[in-house]
């Protein structure tokens, strides 16, 4: 989990557009963010294994 201070800082309007970055809305993680699903890889993996994300299934080959 991200610190509460980091979450509050992210919510503020940035002075420059370049400083904006994506953060997972579920856990607050800023790294390994998947834009397509709007969450980090850890939350994505957890929800996908519980079959809570429609259209996602485990691949095997």
From Swiss-Prot:
<protein>
    <recommendedName>
        <fullName>Small ribosomal subunit protein uS14</fullName>
    </recommendedName>
</protein>
<dbReference type="Pfam" id="PF00253">
    <property type="entry name" value="Ribosomal_S14"/>
</dbReference>
<dbReference type="InterPro" id="IPR018271">
    <property type="entry name" value="Ribosomal_uS14_CS"/>
</dbReference>
<keyword id="KW-0689">Ribosomal protein</keyword>
<keyword id="KW-0862">Zinc</keyword>
<keyword id="KW-0694">RNA-binding</keyword>
<dbReference type="GO" id="GO:0003735">
    <property type="term" value="F:structural constituent of ribosome"/>
</dbReference>
<dbReference type="GO" id="GO:0006412">
    <property type="term" value="P:translation"/>
</dbReference>
<dbReference type="InterPro" id="IPR043140">
    <property type="entry name" value="Ribosomal_uS14_sf"/>
</dbReference>
<keyword id="KW-0479">Metal-binding</keyword>
<comment type="similarity">
    <text>Belongs to the universal ribosomal protein uS14 family. Zinc-binding uS14 subfamily.</text>
</comment>
<comment type="subunit">
    <text>Part of the 30S ribosomal subunit. Contacts proteins S3 and S10.</text>
</comment>
<keyword id="KW-0699">rRNA-binding</keyword>
<dbReference type="GO" id="GO:0015935">
    <property type="term" value="C:small ribosomal subunit"/>
</dbReference>
<comment type="function">
    <text>Binds 16S rRNA, required for the assembly of 30S particles and may also be responsible for determining the conformation of the 16S rRNA at the A site.</text>
</comment>
<feature type="binding site">
    <location>
        <position position="40"/>
    </location>
    <ligand>
        <name>Zn(2+)</name>
    </ligand>
</feature>
<feature type="binding site">
    <location>
        <position position="27"/>
    </location>
    <ligand>
        <name>Zn(2+)</name>
    </ligand>
</feature>
<dbReference type="InterPro" id="IPR001209">
    <property type="entry name" value="Ribosomal_uS14"/>
</dbReference>
<dbReference type="GO" id="GO:0019843">
    <property type="term" value="F:rRNA binding"/>
</dbReference>
<dbReference type="InterPro" id="IPR023053">
    <property type="entry name" value="Ribosomal_uS14_bact"/>
</dbReference>
<keyword id="KW-0687">Ribonucleoprotein</keyword>
<dbReference type="GO" id="GO:0005737">
    <property type="term" value="C:cytoplasm"/>
</dbReference>
<feature type="binding site">
    <location>
        <position position="24"/>
    </location>
    <ligand>
        <name>Zn(2+)</name>
    </ligand>
</feature>
<feature type="binding site">
    <location>
        <position position="43"/>
    </location>
    <ligand>
        <name>Zn(2+)</name>
    </ligand>
</feature>
<dbReference type="GO" id="GO:0008270">
    <property type="term" value="F:zinc ion binding"/>
</dbReference>
């Amino acid at each position: 989990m991200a610190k509460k201070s980091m979450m509050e800082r992210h919510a503020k309007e940035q002075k420059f557009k370049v400083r904006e970055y994506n953060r997972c809305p579920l856990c607050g993680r800023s790294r390994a963010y998947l834009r397509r699903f709007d969450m980090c890889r850890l939350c994505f993996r957890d929800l996908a294994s519980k079959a809570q994300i429609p259209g996602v299934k485990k691949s095997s080959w």
